[in-house]
Amino acid sequence: MEKNLYSMKGKVCLITGGSTGLGSYIAHGFLAAGASRVYITARSKDNLVKKKNELEKISDGECIAIKSDLSSLDGVNKLVSEIRAREQHIDVLVNNAGIGLGTPIKTMKVEDWDRTMELNTKSPIFLTQALLDMLSKNATLE
C-alpha cells in the first residue's frame, strides 16, 4: 500500500511554470515516479525545450512542453484548448506559474501589479475551473 501511495504510474499531469525552479523539480518527481505524460508550461520556449529534453532522459514517461502566457484569461483559455485537444482527462494539476515584482512600492506601476495579480491569483482559479471536468474523471478520495 505505502509503495503505491507515491506511484504516479500512468498519470497525466499538467504543471504551469514547469520549465524552471520548483515546477521543474515537481515535473522531475512525477516522471521519476512513473507518470506517463507530464505537460510543462512556461513563457520561454527555449527554457521549455531544454527542460523537456532533460526530463525525458530520466524515465519512460513523456514530457510535453507548451509555451503559454497565463497572465491573461486569453492565455489560460489557449492552454485549456491545447490540453483538451490532446487529453481526455488530467490526473494532476499543479498551478505553479507565478511572478514577483521585486519593485519598491514607491516606483511600482499599476500595469505591473495588475499582471502579477492576473498570473498569481486569477489564472490559477480560472485554469482550475476550466479543467474541473477533466480533473474529476479519474478523481479519487486519496
Model-identified regions with their sequence ranges:
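A short, exposed helix-loop element centered on a Lys and neighboring polar residues
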Residues: 128-129
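Active-site loop of short-chain dehydrogenase/reductase
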Residues: 11, 89-90, 135-142
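Conserved NAD(P)H cofactor-binding loop of Rossmann-fold oxidoreductase domains
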Residues: 96-101
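Conserved glycine-rich cofactor-binding loop
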Residues: 19-21
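Conserved glycine-rich Rossmann-like NAD(P)H-binding loop of the short-chain dehydrogenase/reductase
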Residues: 35-50
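Substrate-binding pocket helix/loop in short-chain dehydrogenase/reductase
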Residues: 104-105, 112-114
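The beta1-alpha1 cofactor-binding region of Rossmann-like NAD(H)/NADP(H)-dependent oxidoreductases
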Residues: 46, 67-78, 110
